[in-house]
Amino acid sequence: MSKTLLVMAGGTGGHVFPGLAVADRLKAQGWTIHWLGTADRMEAELVPAHGYPISFIDIQGVRGNGIKRLLVAPYRIVKSVLQARRVLKTIRPDVVLGMGGFASGPGGVAAWLSGIPLLLHEQNAAAGLTNKLLARLAKRVLMAFPGAFAPSRRTAVVGNPVRPEVVALPDPQLRSGAEPLRLLIVGGSLGARVLNEQVPPAVAAAGVPIEVRHQCGKGNRDAVAEAYAKQGVAAEVSEFIKDMAGAYAWADLVVCRAGALTVSEVAAAGVAAIFVPLPHAVDDHQTRNALTLVDGGAAEFLPQSELTTASLAARLSWLAGRRETLLNMAQAARRVAITDAAERVADECKRLATGQIEREL
């Protein structure tokens, strides 16, 4: 008999894309997939575009948003839990998979109240508040990186599901190029203002030949392209890179934030990186994410407070002349990567749906 999975994931690509990777794998095995999200975030368009039906609940974040929002938060949470329960009664899933985003909290509570097995996946090296709370209700808690939760019989490290075309990239040694240095800048879907402002002059000041591809975020292309032009640097600037696998394959070095999915893709691709974590990320999770590769010799760490034209130019100049170092970093990244994460999460869903996990616990 066909099984049904309800995926709760939304808000950012770091939540949605791993959820889609798991959904695609289970769909190929005959499962029915449904989604729970919010109507004003990216999942509202992205999930239907991938062929999956989605239901919406009304919920917003409550951390750090002022007294008024905190006062009305209990009412909104109860309302969203009731909305999620109605969705569950209609869909009747065998398993509910929480991948993060605003809908995961109410949806996870609704699953527990409805007696439906709840499986959590924490993408970051530091667990978020919602998953910390839901972990008490979940049958199983999966982690992308060690340390997000204390080891127990209910937890497992499975990695972050990444795009299969990234996993399929050839060995870094086969991609290692000669001069000039090929530099990929990844700022995320919204771009990273500090990278958009600091990288163009740093490339010019490095004093070595560098080819640049810069993903700058929506609405920033003209300004960033002009910044490179003023510095006399030829650069390919785009708001969004559709073929990230191709971009990673091209690059000798990536300069980027340290979101969970970015760190996992850098590792899976096997490419050297300089991470500039978002300094105000909740619980400083981007620093924790970055250190999983930095500590393994696969990447360098550059706090935003230390990012200047001079500091970045010096690092680019130094690395450009050390191809063996870049290759060693890329190979170290590949060794750290968990490339079958989507399969591992899908297997946990199947074990939960058949009661195997209940028997083991």
UniProtKB/Swiss-Prot annotation:
Top-level taxon in the UniProt lineage: Bacteria
Membrane topology: Peripheral membrane protein
Gene Ontology BP annotations: carbohydrate metabolic process; cell division; cell wall organization; lipid glycosylation; peptidoglycan biosynthetic process; regulation of cell shape
GO cellular component entries: plasma membrane
Assigned protein family: Belongs to the glycosyltransferase 28 family. MurG subfamily.
This protein's UniProt keywords: Cell cycle, Cell division, Cell inner membrane, Cell membrane, Cell shape, Cell wall biogenesis/degradation, Glycosyltransferase, Membrane, Peptidoglycan synthesis, Transferase
Function text: Cell wall formation. Catalyzes the transfer of a GlcNAc subunit on undecaprenyl-pyrophosphoryl-MurNAc-pentapeptide (lipid intermediate I) to form undecaprenyl-pyrophosphoryl-MurNAc-(pentapeptide)GlcNAc (lipid intermediate II).
Keyword Amino-acid biosynthesis: no
Protein name (record): UDP-N-acetylglucosamine--N-acetylmuramyl-(pentapeptide) pyrophosphoryl-undecaprenol N-acetylglucosamine transferase
Species this chain originates from: Aeromonas hydrophila subsp. hydrophila (strain ATCC 7966 / DSM 30187 / BCRC 13018 / CCUG 14551 / JCM 1027 / KCTC 2358 / NCIMB 9240 / NCTC 8049)
MF terms in GO: UDP-N-acetyl-D-glucosamine:N-acetylmuramoyl-L-alanyl-D-glutamyl-meso-2,6-diaminopimelyl-D-alanyl-D-alanine-diphosphoundecaprenol 4-beta-N-acetylglucosaminlytransferase activity; undecaprenyldiphospho-muramoylpentapeptide beta-N-acetylglucosaminyltransferase activity
Species classification: Bacteria, Pseudomonadati, Pseudomonadota, Gammaproteobacteria, Aeromonadales
Pathway linked to the protein: Cell wall biogenesis; peptidoglycan biosynthesis
E.C. code: 2.4.1.227
UniProt subcellular location: Cell inner membrane
Class of the enzyme per the UniProt entry, highest EC level: transferase
CDD domains listed in its UniProt record: GT28_MurG
Keyword Cell cycle carried by entry: yes
Main location: membrane
